[in-house]
Amino acid sequence: MGTHLLLEVYNVPFEKLNDPQKIEETMVKAVETEDLTILNIFTHQFDPYGVTTLISLAESHLSCHTWPEKGCVAIDIFTCGSKNPRSVASVSYTHLTLPTNREV
């Protein structure tokens, strides 16, 4: 059948979780790492904050829901066949949690 992963990440900066363009770009990058076939993308910005992105895939789906006020993001990935949802989760996690600025 396939593999289903749920990922919840906490303590993510508000600005990273309330930017619909950044969330969508991150999710697209994530599915591209496994050469998954995107069928449709839907992104919605909630008022006053929060973003949901849904990506329909030929191999199944990816969804991302953010709660910036709580610093939380939930990502749901299901892939059929030999595609690896773990690498999709890894890219999503890395892009959403790395600091935007670093001082050395």
Description of each model-found segment:
Residues 4-6, 24, 32:
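N-terminal intrinsically disordered, cationic/polar leader segments
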Residues 1-18:
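Terminal, regulation- and interaction-focused segments at domain boundaries
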Residues 14-19, 83-87:
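Short, conserved charged micro-motifs
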Residues 61-81:
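Mid-chain, well-packed structural core segment of small domains
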Residues 94-100:
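Conserved small/polar residues in nucleotide/adenosyl-binding loops
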Residues 37, 41-55:
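Compact, glycine-rich, soluble single-domain proteins
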